[in-house]
Every structure is written in structure tokens, then in C-alpha cells.
């Protein structure tokens, strides 16, 4: 009798899996742990329930399940949502994933109606739907965070439209720009990032549900109804493609990698600018840390860590590309590995953008240090060359003349603006008394007043444009 009871318990344990009737022995505990995803995919529980409710609504509308079944499913799902919100829902490793955990609890609550929910669908199209629902929400959040970051950058840019700093190429002083102009470069980058995410969302926003395992279903389902209920723009047009590809996730990770690349470039500059050797800015204390041994230290840990996290996001992109490259159609278990990289990419982006929007708005600008740095390195040499061109010289001749002048100034230990009119006319007689205004930092930036230029008036216009674009919804 004891042996029979033990055998029955083993059979019951094996039936924890929805597919267990096909097998003669249960999977090992190690295999359970190895193949289970519930520890990380349970974050999609609300999206899974949304998808299931829309599916149940369609099944009832099509006469595939009864109105009473639908009411029972809705009641059970509301109870499950309440348990999840209260933290009392019991997630079981034996049930593998978020889908089967919720289905098992639903059956416990409403009986056979819960068993009918899975009619006309597979976990293959179910999980693809969950991911798209989740990712759509994440994209909307990230687009708004990019808006906030751009707004913060434009606010500081407007305040510093005329704050002169050196512009660099090869990390060598090149030409004067304004700090506002420099910050607006990042506002442009993050604007394109938002556009990329919005474009990605269009391809995310197609409904896979109804593809079932891979070939569709023989039930008279109405996929368009489900799409409308869940706010999708349409349905995936091929059942094999719907369940097997994750290109929308790869595209999201690629957009995320670009966002983090731009964050990393900004981070590098924040670290450099905050260095005492440069001293262009200071960051608020809440974004910095100290040293356990050196009492004087104020370290820009947030931008440094963001720079490091860029590699993390890039790694998720490569992992997803590698995951997909060798898979035949249709669904393969490999695709279970898509979620952790997607989840971590979204989490990293969300946290990083939230912090940077706050940090950027609190940058303390050290304008005197910026100006002093711009006075070094012959930043207005190009202005002198342009001056000569406007007096009829070919640019290459003007370039050579100014190069000689710069070399002479280096030997004399002075700047071009320090030369007398007579000294300058020795290089070319066309140089007039107006040259010294041309060679000032203010004259240099003011001259670049075309669209996209660094003239303060243009910087103010561009900052105001970005502020208008990013005004709070």
C-alpha cells in the first residue's frame, strides 16, 4: 500500500508540468533548475495576464468558450493580480515559467474554465506576446526619460549660450565654442535615440498571438480582435515568423547600445571636465563618492560607472545576435535566453537615464576656467585664415600664412591676439585694424551664426527649440 501511494505521489509530481503525460519519468532537479525561467520571467506576469484576458475575451466572442468560462477566467485573473500585488503569490520552480505558474493558480481558483484558457494558443506565441507587451511599455518609459534628459541639457545650454570654452579635435584645442552649443550636441544625439526607439516600437507593436506553436490553429479565432484589445497596430502575418524571431528585441538592444554609447561619451567628458587639471564643471555631491583612504577625494563615480555599464549593454546585444544566428525555424528553447539580456538592458537604460536627467540639470559651470582654457592653443587661428580668404587669398595660402604666424607666436610665447597690427601686417598687408576683434573669443563664436553654428544667438534659438520639443506632457 505504501509503495502504491509513493508511486501515485511521483505521478502527481511529474504532472506539475503541463506536458508531463508524454513522459515516463520526471525531470531531475538539476534539469528543472537549468530549464526554469520563472525566477526572471515572472516580471512579465501582468503582461501575461493582460494577454490571457484578451485571448479569453476573443475565445468567448467566437463561441469557443462559454460566457461563464470567460467570467470565471476574469474573476480568477483578478484574484491572481491581487495576490501578485500583495506579494503572496507562490511562484513554483516546478512550473517552469510565468505562464504555467499563472495557469496552475487559475485552475485552482476556477477549475475547468482555467483549463480552457489555453485553447488555440501555445506558450510559443504566448511568450512572444508577453515580451512585446512588456517591451512596448519599456520603450514608452525610455522615450520619456530621454525627453527629460534632453530638457535638462537644453536648460543648462540656454543658461550657457554665451559661455565660451575650447572646442577640441584629437583632444587638442581647435576652435572656440560655447558650452551651451556643446551640450546641445548631446541633446541632438539623444533626440535621435528617442526616434530610434519610437521606430523600433512600430515593429514591436504587432501581435504574435494566434500563431500557436508554429502553424496557427484550427479554431476560428479572431486575431484582429485581440490586437485591438491589446492596442497592437496589427498582427504578425506569418505564424512561423511570429513565434521564432526576436529581431524586435535585437533592434531594441541595438538602440539601447547607441543610447549607452552616447551616455558613455558624455560621461567621459564629465569625468574630464571635473578633473582639477581641467576644472570646467563640478557635479552635485549626491552623484559622487569619496575615498576610504584619501580624505580630499570627490570622485565622479556615476559617470564612470555609466561608462562601464555601456559594455554590459553592448554585451547583451552581441549575445542576442549570437543566440539567433544558428536557429532553424521555428521556436527553439534557445530563445529562453533572450529575456535576461532584454530585461537587464531595459533596467540599465532606465536607471541611467533617470540619474543623468537629474545630474545634467545640476551641473555647476566654472565659466572662468573654460574661458581661460579657450585662450590657449591658438583657438582663433582659423578665424585669421578665414579673414585672409575674405580678402581674396586662396584658403591654402591663407592656411600656410597663419601656420607660420602660429609657429612664430609659439617661439615668442604669445597668442595671435597679442600681436600688434604691424606684426600681423608683416604676414600679409591686407590685414586691417578690424583684425583684433576677429581674433577675440567672442568675435570667433559670434561669427558662426548660421544654422547649427555656435553663435550665442543661434545656441539660444536651438536651446529654446529643444525645450519646446521636450516640454512635459
Curated annotation (Swiss-Prot):
InterPro entries: Arg_succ_lyase_C (IPR029419), Argininosuccinate_lyase (IPR009049), Fumarase/histidase_N (IPR024083), Fumarate_lyase_CS (IPR020557), Fumarate_lyase_fam (IPR000362), Fumarate_lyase_N (IPR022761), L-Aspartase-like (IPR008948). One of its GO terms (biological process) is arginine biosynthetic process via ornithine. The keyword RNA-binding does not apply. Its EC number is 4.3.2.1. Signal peptide: none annotated. Pfam families: ASL_C2, Lyase_1. Pathway: Amino-acid biosynthesis; L-arginine biosynthesis; L-arginine from L-ornithine and carbamoyl phosphate: step 3/3. SUPFAM superfamilies: L-aspartase-like (SSF48557). PROSITE patterns: FUMARATE_LYASES. Keywords: Amino-acid biosynthesis, Arginine biosynthesis, Cytoplasm, Lyase. The keyword Transmembrane helix does not apply. It comes from the Bacteria. It is found in: Cytoplasm. One of its GO terms (molecular function) is argininosuccinate lyase activity. Its main location: cytoplasm. GO terms for cellular component: cytosol. Disulfide bonds: none annotated. It catalyses: 2-(N(omega)-L-arginino)succinate = fumarate + L-arginine. Belongs to the lyase 1 family. Argininosuccinate lyase subfamily. This is Argininosuccinate lyase. It comes from Bordetella pertussis (strain Tohama I / ATCC BAA-589 / NCTC 13251).
Amino acid at each position: 500500500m505504501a509503495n502504491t501511494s509513493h508511486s501515485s505521489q511521483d505521478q502527481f509530481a511529474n504532472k506539475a508540468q503541463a506536458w508531463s503525460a508524454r513522459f515516463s519519468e520526471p525531470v531531475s532537479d538539476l534539469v528543472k533548475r537549468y530549464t526554469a525561467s520563472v525566477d526572471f520571467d515572472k516580471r512579465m506576469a501582468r503582461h501575461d495576464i493582460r494577454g490571457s484576458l484578451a485571448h479569453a475575451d476573443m475565445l468567448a466572442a467566437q463561441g469557443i468558450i462559454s460566457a461563464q468560462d470567460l467570467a470565471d477566467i476574469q474573476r480568477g485573473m483578478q484574484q491572481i493580480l491581487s495576490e501578485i500585488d500583495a506579494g503572496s503569490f507562490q511562484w513554483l520552480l516546478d512550473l517552469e515559467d510565468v505562464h504555467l505558474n499563472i495557469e496552475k493558480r487559475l485552475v485552482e481558483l476556477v477549475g475547468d474554465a482555467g483549463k480552457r484558457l489555453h485553447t488555440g494558443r501555445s506558450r510559443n506565441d504566448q511568450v512572444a506576446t508577453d515580451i512585446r507587451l512588456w517591451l512596448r511599455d519599456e520603450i514608452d518609459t525610455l522615450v520619456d526619460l530621454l525627453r527629460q534628459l534632453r530638457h535638462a541639457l537644453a536648460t543648462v545650454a540656454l543658461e550657457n549660450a554665451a559661455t565660451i570654452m575650447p572646442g577640441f579635435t584629437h583632444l587638442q584645442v581647435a576652435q572656440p565654442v560655447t558650452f551651451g552649443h556643446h551640450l546641445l550636441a548631446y541633446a541632438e544625439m539623444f533626440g535621435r535615440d528617442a526616434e530610434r526607439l519610437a521606430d523600433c516600437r512600430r515593429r514591436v507593436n504587432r501581435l504574435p498571438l494566434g500563431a500557436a506553436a508554429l502553424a496557427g490553429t484550427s479554431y476560428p479565432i479572431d486575431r484582429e480582435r485581440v490586437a485591438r484589445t491589446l492596442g497592437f497596430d496589427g498582427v504578425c502575418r506569418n505564424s512561423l515568423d511570429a513565434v521564432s524571431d526576436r529581431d524586435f528585441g535585437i533592434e531594441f538592444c541595438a538602440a539601447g547600445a547607441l543610447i549607452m554609447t552616447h551616455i558613455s561619451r558624455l560621461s567621459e567628458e564629465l569625468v574630464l571636465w571635473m578633473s582639477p587639471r581641467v576644472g570646467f564643471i563640478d557635479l552635485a555631491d549626491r552623484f559622487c563618492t569619496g575615498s576610504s583612504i584619501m580624505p580630499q577625494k570627490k570622485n565622479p563615480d556615476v559617470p564612470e560607472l555609466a561608462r562601464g555599464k555601456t559594455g554590459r549593454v553592448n554585451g547583451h546585444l552581441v549575445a542576442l545576435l549570437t543566440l539567433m544566428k544558428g536557429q532553424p525555424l521555428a521556436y527553439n528553447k534557445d530563445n529562453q535566453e533572450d529575456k535576461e539580456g532584454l530585461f537587464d538592458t531595459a533596467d540599465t537604460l532606465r536607471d541611467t537615464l533617470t540619474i543623468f536627467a537629474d545630474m545634467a540639470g545640476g551641473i555647476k559651470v566654472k565659466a572662468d576656467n573654460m574661458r581661460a582654457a579657450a585662450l590657449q592653443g591658438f583657438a582663433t587661428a582659423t578665424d585669421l585664415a578665414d579673414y585672409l580668404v575674405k580678402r581674396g587669398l586662396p584658403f591654402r595660402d591663407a592656411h600656410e600664412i597663419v601656420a607660420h604666424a602660429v609657429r612664430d607666436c609659439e617661439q615668442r610665447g604669445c597668442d595671435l591676439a597679442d600681436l600688434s597690427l604691424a606684426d600681423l601686417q608683416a604676414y600679409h598687408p591686407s590685414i586691417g585694424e578690424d583684425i583684433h576683434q576677429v581674433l577675440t573669443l567672442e568675435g570667433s563664436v559670434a561669427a558662426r551664426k548660421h544654422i547649427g553654428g555656435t553663435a550665442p544667438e543661434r545656441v539660444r534659438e536651438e536651446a529654446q527649440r529643444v525645450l519646446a520639443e521636450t516640454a512635459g506632457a
